[in-house]
Regions:
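Sec-dependent N-terminal signal peptides
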Residues: 4-12
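Phosphate-group recognition and catalysis centered on beta-loop-alpha active-site segments
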Residues: 14-322
């Protein structure tokens, strides 16, 4: 497809308010991930959606954390020192204990810290409850902000999290209690969780996460019997990821950006799927995703996505500072 046609289609989508700029874990490249200061930073930049990860503590508290156990690269204990190894498993720990840890700073000298040189520390930041994020987006002027909530479960370590179905139920109940069904999507790499959400809460959108890389592959193309991640929708039967998601009743595909090309984007959109690309932080890759015609970008640096949209003369979400 000629580039001018791709840009024209993208411009039309943006003008219709369809393009989705998501702040990944808040704005991980600018502020500590999955913290209230991080979400405030994303809102100050201007995003359509706040993306975050959901975990459940031993006493049933829904909280925000990407990892099943506290990550030593971002976590300091009550003594103020960084953890020297993997921290407590969240599913095995009460929330009051988890709240004692400080997650407001990257551990110097780590490879993880090297990925985010622009991140500004926020000492004293704690693992927030999901209800605190709900309160943030209910504030005046933030009524249009959406939430993308990832259910963090895995078939490869089932003892470290709540099981997919009860996890989905707990999250759905919380979203409904907050009255945020129309502003929320629920996403997961483990499609069992998404099937559960679709069965119990058809009013809440689901997002099918995928990656097909050597380091992690939840699709398992060519794997006998299919992947444990895809809830009985094997690649061998459907022939492509968009067709798998369509068969599963999905409406949104969120793919690792390195797996996407124009043919896959066009195939998915022809099936009626919305296509998101994650996690896109490099300016050249941001430009490439826009050229492919994706419907949204998930980024640790939403400011850089905003800059590229501005450079192209396209609209971007408004800033919503406190």
């Amino acid at each position: 497809m000629p580039r001018w046609i791709t840009l024209a289609l993208l411009c039309t989508a943006l003008q219709a308010g369809a393009f989705d700029l998501q702040g990944h874990r808040g704005a991980r490249g600018l502020a500590p991930e999955n913290t209230l200061p991080g979400f405030e930073r994303a809102l100050a930049v201007g995003v359509t959606t706040l993306e975050t990860d959901i975990a459940i503590s031993a006493d049933g508290v829904l909280l925000l954390s990407h990892d099943p156990a506290l990550n030593p690269d971002i976590t300091r204990g009550p003594d103020g020192q960084f953890l020297t190894g993997r921290g407590p498993v969240i599913w095995h720990s009460p929330y009051a204990e988890l709240r004692r840890y400080d997650v407001g700073r990257l551990k110097p000298g780590t490879r993880y810290a090297a990925q985010f040189p622009a991140q500004q520390p926020q000492d004293g930041a704690r693992l927030p409850k999901l209800e605190e994020l709900f309160a943030l987006v209910r504030q005046p002027g933030r009524e249009g902000v959406r939430l993308a909530l990832e259910i963090k479960v895995t078939p490869t370590a089932p003892d470290e999290t709540q099981a997919p179905e009860p996890f989905a139920r707990a999250l759905v109940d919380a979203v409904r209690a907050a009255g945020l069904q129309q502003r929320t999507t629920i996403l997961s790499f483990d499609w069992r969780a998404l099937q559960a959400v679709q069965a119990i809460a058809p009013e809440i959108g689901t997002v099918y996460l995928t990656i097909q890389q050597r380091s992690f592959d939840n699709i398992g193309a060519g794997k006998p019997g299919g992947s444990a991640w895809t809830a009985g929708f094997p690649h061998a039967e459907y022939g492509s990821v968009p067709k798998m998601i369509h068969a599963a009743g999905g409406r949104v595909w969120s793919s690792f950006h390195g797996d996407l090309d124009v043919a896959k984007v066009k195939e998915a959109q022809a099936l009626g799927l919305t296509v998101l690309a994650w996690t896109v932080n490099d300016p050249a890759q941001i430009a490439r995703m826009l050229d492919l015609g994706v419907d949204g970008i998930v980024s640790d640096r939403p400011d850089l996505v905003r800059d590229e949209l501005q450079r192209r003369g396209l609209p971007w979400p408004p800033a919503r500072p406190r």
